[in-house]
Amino acid sequence: SEYACASGMSFLSTDTKGDVMRNYGTIAKEHYGYQVSVIDLRNPTRSNGNNLLHLVNKYMDLYKENPKELVYKARCEKYAKIISKTIILSGMDAASFGQNAYFYDAAEGLLTATILLVAEFCEPEKRHIVSVFKIIQELLAPSQKKGKNQFQQLMELLPDDHKAKWFAGAALNTAEQSMASVM
């Protein structure tokens, strides 16, 4: 962190305990002029009002207004994928996943698909990461339909060419027990 501060570049630190924020946040702010923000995925009320889905929502809105401008849709999907990868990897190297790589890929796809659905279908005040996690939690509830988990049932409601289905690929073709590991 000290080297990043001294170089003046922007950076992101993962900080599960809050130590980096406590020890370096003040120094970065007071001595190097950094703007320090906290994004707390477990307790969003402790975050600095940063909506992780801002760019996804922005480009989804632009695409809805201009459906022929596929560049907006592509950017929306790109930012959804970046958010998913950032959350799933959380500072780890994907090469270290080994035998579990399938589950991480499926989780990333499921998260990307859910982010896109929230950006497309939720009311503006509900289009944030907390809604994404709430929906995923709700999808963990037992299914009434044998052989189909709730996520698969949700995806069945979408048109065949919907991009969320494409991102969710691996998660859609997994057994119910494996799906619990993905989620």
Provide a role label for each language-model segment.
Residues E2-G109:
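Switch/coupling segment of Walker-type NTPase motor domains
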Residues A94-M183:
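Non-catalytic, charge-rich alpha-helical accessory subdomains
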